[in-house]
Regions:
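N-terminal, polar/charged subdomain of small-to-medium soluble alpha/beta proteins
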Residues: 1-95, 102-132
Length: 132
């Protein structure tokens, strides 16, 4: 499995603004997760004994991702969602994920983005970091 070509966020936004839900939307938020060289343990727990990350093996369960997207549409004020996930062997700087969410007001869209990205990252993907 090899990594995919990243999408164009400009194209995504153009598509979203042409979608039938666009008149209800007052805000779009995007997320672009990338492979970083600092290990999660170093960033989140301050672990000093971690080696730099040089890449990762990344995979996901599409059915589970589709289910959480459907669940996110049930949140108040959310009218548009698009998700792209990479796969395969990724290097530092490679895109892992793009998410675009459109909704009525800022609090609803921010909450939905945090919820969706958190569930995808914590429950639906498999990341195996490759240390240098």
């Amino acid at each position: 499995m090899s990594k995919k070509t990243s999408p164009s966020m400009d194209s995504w936004l153009k598509e979203a603004k042409a979608h039938e839900s666009a008149p209800k939307i007052g805000m779009y938020l995007t997320h672009n997760g990338i492979v970083r060289e600092s290990a999660k343990a170093k960033v989140r727990q301050g672990a000093a004994d971690t080696r730099p990350v040089v890449g990762m093996q990344f995979s996901y369960n599409q059915e589970a991702v589709d289910a959480i997207i459907a669940e996110t549409y049930k949140l108040d004020g959310i009218f548009y969602i698009k998700v792209w996930l990479n796969e395969g062997e990724l290097s530092v700087g490679d895109d892992i994920m793009y998410v675009l969410i459109g909704g009525d007001i800022r609090p609803n869209v921010i909450d939905a983005l945090q919820n969706l990205v958190g569930k995808i990252k914590n429950e639906m993907v498999q990341e195996v970091k490759i240390a240098g």
